[in-house]
């Protein structure tokens, strides 16, 4: 019986571990101890429904603004001893738009009030986009890049963990 218990605990631990994101495609980013871990939209949806606290970053490696924002987010997250869920919006090479991403409709359901409308009148997730979620609710979000990017990320983590 004790062996069965140990085996079950090991299975649970393995099933609960996060997969570190492969950020090697991001130009000029070489931090092997980065804070990013892979997450699917469905996993994110589950965490929000379970009222969890997390930071999620939507982006992709060929996005110029993502290339600029990602190292800043990495540094600020490290300063706050936080990890960041990464959802690669162009994981599949056939995806030509963030709207092609798997479960995009779920993203619109979860974050629609924070998304802008595109030229066709559809809600569009522009990248980079970071959501700071506390107890299942968005407490802060940062879209794109600006001169106060570091300060914006710091504010998001402060609100998330206050």
Task: Report each predicted region and the residues it spans.
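Typically the conserved alpha-helix immediately C-terminal to a functionally engaged Cys/Sec
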Residues: 66-81
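C-terminal motif of bacterial Sec signal peptides marking the signal peptidase cleavage site
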Residues: 12-15
């Amino acid at each position: 019986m004790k062996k069965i218990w140990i085996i079950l605990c090991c299975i649970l631990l393995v099933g609960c571990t996060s997969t570190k994101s492969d950020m090697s495609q991001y130009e000029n980013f070489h931090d092997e101890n980065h804070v990013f871990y892979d997450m699917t939209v469905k996993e994110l949806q589950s965490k929000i429904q379970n009222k969890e606290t997390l930071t999620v970053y939507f982006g992709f490696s060929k996005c110029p603004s993502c290339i600029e924002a990602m190292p800043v987010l990495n540094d600020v997250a490290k300063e706050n001893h936080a990890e960041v869920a990464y959802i690669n919006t162009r994981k599949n090479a056939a995806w030509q738009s963030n709207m092609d991403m798997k479960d995009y409709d779920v993203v619109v359901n979860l974050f629609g009030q924070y998304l802008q409308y595109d030229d066709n009148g559809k809600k569009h997730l522009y990248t980079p986009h970071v959501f700071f979620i506390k107890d299942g609710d968005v407490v802060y979000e940062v879209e794109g890049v600006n001169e106060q990017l570091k300060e914006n990320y710091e504010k998001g983590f402060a609100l998330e963990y206050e």
